From Swiss-Prot:
4'-phosphopantetheine is transferred from CoA to a specific serine of apo-ACP by acpS. This modification is essential for activity because fatty acids are bound in thioester linkage to the sulfhydryl of the prosthetic group. Residues 1-60 form a transit peptide. Belongs to the acyl carrier protein (ACP) family. This is Acyl carrier protein 3, chloroplastic. GO terms for cellular component: chloroplast. One of its GO terms (molecular function) is acyl carrier activity. Pathway: Lipid metabolism; fatty acid biosynthesis. It is found in: Plastid, Chloroplast. It comes from Cuphea lanceolata.
Length: 143
């Protein structure tokens, strides 16, 4: 996850090599909850306001293929019917998962993707999207 901070005339996104001048930032930004910005040919669809009017968090979302695989693993681990609607926004708790189920889901993800998830990272996973984003980060770190 990248973070961004606002300066007097530009917004610098630390993990991307770009900066935006004030003219590129929509006026009244403090009232927005999220905004999409094209940066160096990439779109950051989840640029969200956090603390203060010009402080942001950029969420780079995982590939749809990864999200779909995570959905299938979650359905299998929770023994959900095949026609159950599970998507990136699905919270494990809303699907009926308790803490043991969540541990089993993480173990299934580790096996499926050939990764190892640290306990601290596993505890931060609340949704299918959280899991998919973490998987892509860990798989990317292995390369």
């Amino acid at each position: 996850m990248a973070t961004a901070a606002a300066g007097s005339s530009l917004i610098c996104i630390k993990s991307a090599s770009c900066s935006l001048n004030r003219a590129q930032v929509p006026s009244g930004l403090s009232s927005l909850r999220s905004v999409s910005l094209p940066i160096s040919g990439k779109i950051f669809p989840s640029l969200r306001s956090s603390r203060g009017p010009l402080s942001f968090r950029v969420c780079c979302q995982a590939k749809q293929e990864t999200v779909t695989r995570v959905c299938e693993i979650v359905k299998k681990q929770l023994a959900l019917p095949e026609d159950s609607e599970v998507n990136g926004l699905s919270k494990f708790s809303a699907l009926g998962a308790d803490s043991l189920d969540t541990v089993e889901i993480v173990m299934g993800l580790e096996e499926e993707f050939g990764i190892s998830v640290e306990e601290e990272s596993a505890q931060s996973i609340q949704t299918v999207q959280d899991a998919a984003d973490l998987i892509e980060k860990l798989v990317g770190n292995k390369k």
